[in-house]
UniProtKB/Swiss-Prot annotation:
Subunit structure: Binds to the N-terminal domain of the chaperone ClpA.
PANTHER family: ATP-DEPENDENT CLP PROTEASE ADAPTER PROTEIN CLPS, ATP-DEPENDENT CLP PROTEASE ADAPTER PROTEIN CLPS1, CHLOROPLASTIC
Protein name: ATP-dependent Clp protease adapter protein ClpS 2
UniProt record similarity statement: Belongs to the ClpS family.
Single GO biological process annotation from the record: proteolysis
Organism field: Agrobacterium fabrum (strain C58 / ATCC 33970) (Agrobacterium tumefaciens (strain C58))
InterPro entries with a match to the protein in the record: ClpS (IPR022935), ClpS_core (IPR003769), Ribosomal_bL12_C/ClpS-like (IPR014719)
One Pfam family here: ClpS
Function: Involved in the modulation of the specificity of the ClpAP-mediated ATP-dependent protein degradation.
C-alpha cells in the first residue's frame, strides 16, 4: 500500500444552471364571421375557461382586434392555438389563434 495521504474531502457538487422556459401568449384574433357564441364554446373547450371568462376574452378580441387567451410554455401554446384554430376550420369558420413570445 501507498504511504501517501488520501484526501477524503467530498467534492462540491456542481448544479447545472436551469433556466425557466420562455413563455408564449396564445392570441385570439377577431374576425367578422365567426359567431361569438362559437368562440366562447371553443375557449371553454380548449382553454377550460368559464362561460364568463370566455365571453370577456371574446369581447376583448372583438373590441380591440385581438386578446391574450393564456400565457404558457411554447409547445403548450402552439398545441392549444392549433387545436382551437382547427375547431373553427372544422365548423367552417375563419377562427384564428396565434402564438407570440411573452415580453
Amino acid at each position: 500500500m501507498s504511504d501517501s495521504p488520501v484526501d477524503l474531502k467530498p467534492k462540491p457538487k456542481v448544479k447545472p444552471k436551469l433556466e425557466r422556459p420562455k413563455l408564449y401568449k396564445v392570441m385570439l384574433l377577431n374576425d367578422d364571421y365567426t359567431p361569438r357564441e362559437f368562440v366562447t364554446v371553443v375557449l371553454k373547450a380548449v382553454f377550460r375557461m368559464s362561460e364568463d371568462t370566455g365571453r370577456r376574452v371574446m369581447m376583448t378580441a372583438h373590441r380591440f382586434g385581438s386578446a391574450v387567451v393564456v400565457v404558457c410554455e411554447r409547445d403548450i401554446a402552439e398545441t392549444k392555438a392549433k387545436e382551437a384554430t382547427d375547431l373553427g376550420k372544422e365548423a367552417g369558420f375563419p377562427l384564428m389563434f396565434t402564438t407570440e413570445p411573452e415580453e
